[in-house]
Amino acid sequence: MLRNITIFDAQEIQSISNFELGYDVNLDIVKKQIRKLTNDNKHNIIIGFENEQTRKIIGFVHAELYESLYMDTGLNILGLAVDSNFQGQGIG
């Protein structure tokens, strides 16, 4: 199930970022960034995919809205990752 991420998802986001993206990130930094970025919904979109059985985030996408002179509003994907245990199942 797709849903907005919350501060309670920080542990899963940290783990996915570490193991699937290769970023050795600190849990406190992940929490700080979730707080900051989820409060900026005019520029940042962060959606998680929740495992319906465990209610844990098993994948996420972070995108940023942007404007340019030559087209309407665009969307840059800054991060997209799925827990390797769930890859190949159409999640990402």
Regions found by a protein language model. Give the residues of each.
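Acetyl-CoA-dependent GNAT
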Residues: N4-T73, L78
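Residue-level recognition of the GNAT/N-acetyltransferase active site
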Residues: D83
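Conserved acetyl-CoA pyrophosphate-binding loop and the N-cap/start of the following alpha-helix
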Residues: F86, G90-I91
